[in-house]
Design a protein with these regions (language model features):
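Walker A/P-loop
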Residues: 52-71
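Signature of the SF2 helicase/ATPase Hel1-core->accessory helical subdomain module
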Residues: 77, 93, 205-207, 211-388, ...
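Conserved RecA-like ASCE P-loop NTPase motor core of nucleic-acid helicases/translocases
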Residues: 82-88, 490-492, 563-569, 692-694
């Protein structure tokens, strides 16, 4: 573990940390760009005190505070293993590749660190070998490696000179597998983000057979876990943190090692991530992926399997495909019928005797529709047939007789075979059986739809149809499965409080009791920005709003010369405004959905005067420094749609316990979201620009003052000419 540098007169961790951030302290001497900031120093000392005494602290550190160093320094000097969880992979990599090496040099401290991502980011050697075996038999081509082998191997992956691959991408990955130390797909910079082949190669938990795998010792997940268990600082993201907590009780256990202390950065994102990972979902994609991989396993074992076993497997897979197609098509047709009914004015409200529980004003809910048990009952027969088909696949892949083996007694259930049969070399088949059983159990839970702690809904995305159940409240889950793991935990973000109170975030995350610290931004918003609010705009719910918003956006962008993010609360509004903006302006217009997020950001940074039209995924976790981003426009106050299933369920839950959902949930959530969106503009002391919110409710509604009070303390104007004068300074 790290050795605290000798600092005379300093004994407690907080005293050491305070001296590290002093005007002439180690950071000031060693880091050329370091500027002593009172807020950063105060936060660092508060974090140190929390680590020393235990418990929890909520720290809101305004943009420019330097919160990353403020928690990393006490974490490094604490002499305990510390977990740092971030909202994005970008921040993970910044900490691992930039901040920690700089601190190691500045502090003169020796420590080790591991950056851990979700399993799907890593290559599975077993799946690679299976793919190479299948590819090498098809034709001659590029040589591919034959990797890994028994647990007694030294860990060196060798090549089989007799194997060649026809697929150049597979050959490239196979070649890379021989050289990489991490197996992280991020090393393959030229690999398309949405490449289907990676889905067949990723080390997902669903396909993992754990210590039964012949590549277990060479496995990149195993090696990452071992590195982390020997590290002083473990860096993860919220997705891995919650996914790991969700599977901790499974037979494969957790990936993240035990850590004494935890730091959860970008903590405002944790509720949404927890809602996703502590829920249940069955989709046509999940079932089709099972069928696809079951076919691969069946093909690889066809020569060894008894003929009746091979036939049973093929029939079970085809039966599963047929029933999955019927079930998910039925759900899709039901969704379309409900959408038609809403368009005709029938709201299908819960309690009205209708099947669907979507509000009448369901605009924006086209992708997620809340379901009732009555609707699922209409699809129960198809659902039960699908569950039985999954049972057939489970049984077929637990059947492991070879052509030379004696017949086994009939009548054993799948679970009995699971316990009695663990034949060497059949781990892939057993993994397929296990997955089929898990999907069957999840499907039956979803079809029952009886747990009052969950909200049930149908989600469609592209060609995907997802039947989901999400926890209505995650506070208890987050507290028990995440926060209580640590002796001390720090939750921090630039946006945690509403109207000076942490009550909202504390309640949503179960973070009580907890100390509090709120630090203002280090930026001078009075000089760095202005806030433009249009003098007159239609009601956002009016059909006239889109045209008026497009006109205002064009007027603003003409004065800023592009260089802007225009953030929308819905794709519908983006699509309505896009043609007007493209026709009126000569600036390059980039639109979310036309390319990968990372590619769009890179284009924006490198294209002079660019304008990006985007929705939710660009409201946070995006940094563009300098003049390239000189304006951020928000079309409407970002209230979560009451038609969203999870939102509506949470509104109902608050109302049932006698609360006021609008003020307790909808307003605080919208304020934090708006702060994040507008926070994209000023990221450094030299940044300047214009903020604009087009929604007239900031001035016409009583709650508007609550929003205005939460915005950066910038001069407010309703004059478009003031924008031109601002940039003329």
């Amino acid at each position: 573990m790290p050795e605290v540098p000798p600092l005379p007169g300093a004994h407690a961790l907080r005293e050491v940390v305070d001296q590290v951030f002093a005007d002439r302290g180690p950071l000031s001497r060693a880091l050329p760009e370091f500027e002593p900031r009172p807020g950063q120093r105060e936060m660092a000392v508060a974090v140190a005190e929390t680590l020393e005494t235990g418990g929890r602290i909520l720290v809101e550190a305004g943009t420019g505070t330097g919160k990353t160093l403020a928690y990393l320094v006490p974490a490094i000097l604490s002499r305990q293993r510390v977990l740092v969880s971030t909202g994005t992979k970008n921040l993970q990599e910044q900490i691992y590749f930039k901040d920690l090496p700089a601190l190691a040099q500045a502090l003169g401290v020796r420590f080790t660190a591991t950056c851990m991502k979700g399993r799907a980011n890593y290559l599975c050697l077993q799946r690679l070998e299976t793919m190479c075996d299948m590819g090498a038999s098809s034709s001659s081509g590029v040589r591919s490696p034959k990797s890994g082998h028994s647990k007694a191997d030294t860990g060196r992956r060798t090549s089989d000179p007799g194997r060649r691959l026809p697929d150049p991408l597979l050959a490239m990955i196979a070649e890379w597998a021989q050289e990489t130390k991490t197996g992280d797909r991020a090393e393959l910079g030229d690999l398309p983000e949405d490449m289907a082949l990676w889905n067949d190669l990723a080390a997902t938990s669903e396909t993992c057979v754990g210590s039964n795998c012949p590549h277990y010792d060479d496995c990149f997940i195993t090696r990452m876990r071992r590195r982390a268990a020997q590290s002083d600082v473990v860096i993860v993201n919220h997705h891995l943190l919650c996914a790991d907590a969700a599977v901790r009780q499974s037979e494969y256990g957790e990936v993240i090692p035990a850590c004494a202390y935890g730091v959860i950065d970008e903590a405002h994102q944790l509720e949404d991530v927890a809602t996703q990972y502590f829920g249940i979902a069955v989709s046509n994609y999940r079932v089709e992926q099972l069928c696809h991989e079951a076919e691969q396993v069946a093909a690889s074992e066809r020569r060894e399997a008894a003929p009746e076993v091979a036939m049973a497997r093929g029939q079970a897979i085809e039966r599963l495909r047929d029933h999955a197609r019927a079930f998910f098509m039925g759900l899709q047709l039901g969704r379309m019928a409900a959408a038609d009914a809403r368009a005709g004015g029938d709201g299908y409200m819960r309690g009205s005797g209708r099947r669907w529980a979507a509000p009448a004003d369901a605009a924006g809910a086209e992708d997620r529709i809340r379901l009732t048990s009555e609707f699922l009952a209409d699809n129960a027969d198809a659902g039960h047939e699908l569950a039985e088909a999954l049972e057939s696949v489970e049984q077929a892949f637990y059947e492991v007789r070879t052509a030379a083996s004696a017949d086994e007694p009939a009548g054993h259930s799948a679970s009995e075979k699971r316990q009695a049969q663990q034949p060497e070399g059949r781990e892939d088949a057993l993994a397929i059986a296990r997955r089929a059983g898990e999907i069957r159990d999840d499907l039956r839970f979803l079809l029952r739809a009886h747990d009052p702690d969950f909200v049930y809904y149908l989600e469609t995305r592209g060609r995907g149809v997802f039947l989901r159940a999400s926890p209505i409240e995650v506070a208890g889950i987050v507290r028990s499965q995440v926060l209580d793991r640590f002796q001390a935990v720090v939750l921090t973000s630039a946006t945690l409080s509403v109207a000076g109170s942490f009550d909202y975030v504390r309640g949503r995350l179960g973070a009580h009791p907890a100390a509090e610290l709120s630090l203002p931004s280090e930026f001078d918003y009075s000089q760095q920005t202005i806030l433009y609010l249009p003098p007159r705009m239609p009601d956002p719910r009016s059909p006239a709003f889109a045209e008026a918003a497009a006109t205002q956006i064009v007027e603003i962008l003409e004065r800023t010369r592009g260089r802007a993010f225009v953030l929308f609360t819905s794709y519908a509004m983006l699509r309505a405004v896009q043609p007007v903006v493209e026709a009126a302006l000569s600036f390059p217009i980039l639109v979310q959905g036309t390319g990968a997020r990372s590619l769009l950001l890179q284009q924006f940074r490198t294209t002079p005067n660019a304008v990006l039209l985007a929705t939710s995924s660009f409201w946070q976790g995006v940094d563009v420094a300098g003049e390239a981003l000189s304006c951020v426009i928000v079309d409407k106050l970002p209230f979560a749609s009451p038609a969203d299933p999870v939102t509506s369920a949470r509104i109902d839950a608050i109302a049932r316990r006698g609360g006021e959902p609008f003020w307790e949930y909808q307003v605080p959530l919208a304020i934090l979201t708006l702060q994040q969106g507008l926070g994209r503009l000023i990221r450094h002391r030299r940044d300047r620009g214009v903020l604009s919110v087009l929604d007239p409710r900031l001035r016409t509604k009583a709650y508007g003052q609550t929003f205005l009070a939460a915005l950066p303390p910038a001069p407010v104007t309703s004059s478009l000419d003031a924008i031109g004068r601002f940039f003329g300074k």
